[in-house]
């Protein structure tokens, strides 16, 4: 059975590129356009990994990570932050919230897939 990954980004083209790379690697993908939408899309589903942007409307990625980590079912779900933010203090904020990896845009699909393969449980 394919592993499921939730991707959150307010940019449809980014969601499309990430989705194509993940589907090409055999993953199932659920897409959301911000943190509020992402929490709604989780809705008790089995999700093996989450990839989120930081700067999004309604609920940013750091707040989303904090909210996900409060949910017992997703407390240990690995989260990758995929963003244009590259400052160390933002990375520290993301890790403190519970993110396990940080990938800076622009990115190459193999770079993202490498981060995914290191974190997704077999």
Q: Model-predicted segments: where are they?
A:
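Short hydrophobic/Thr-rich beta-strand motif most characteristic of the beta2 strand and flanking loop
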Residues: 26-33, 41
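Active-site beta3 strand of CheY-like receiver
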Residues: 46-51
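Active-site residues of response regulator receiver
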Residues: 53, 83
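Receiver (REC) domain active-site loop signature in two-component systems and cognate sites
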Residues: 56
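A Lys-centered signature of the CheY-like receiver
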Residues: 67, 105
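C-terminal output helix
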Residues: 107-117
């Amino acid at each position: 059975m394919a592993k499921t990954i939730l991707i959150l980004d307010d940019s449809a083209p980014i969601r499309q590129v990430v989705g194509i790379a993940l589907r090409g690697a055999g993953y199932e993908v659920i897409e959301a356009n911000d943190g509020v939408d992402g929490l709604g899309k989780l809705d008790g589903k089995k999700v093996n990994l989450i990839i989120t942007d930081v700067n999004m409307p309604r609920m940013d990625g750091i707040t989303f990570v904090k909210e996900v980590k409060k949910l017992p079912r997703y407390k240990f779900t690995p989260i990758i932050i995929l963003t244009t933010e590259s400052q160390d203090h933002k990375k520290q904020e993301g890790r403190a919230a519970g993110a396990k990896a940080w990938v800076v845009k622009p990115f190459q699909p193999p770079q993202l897939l490498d981060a995914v393969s290191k974190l997704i449980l077999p």
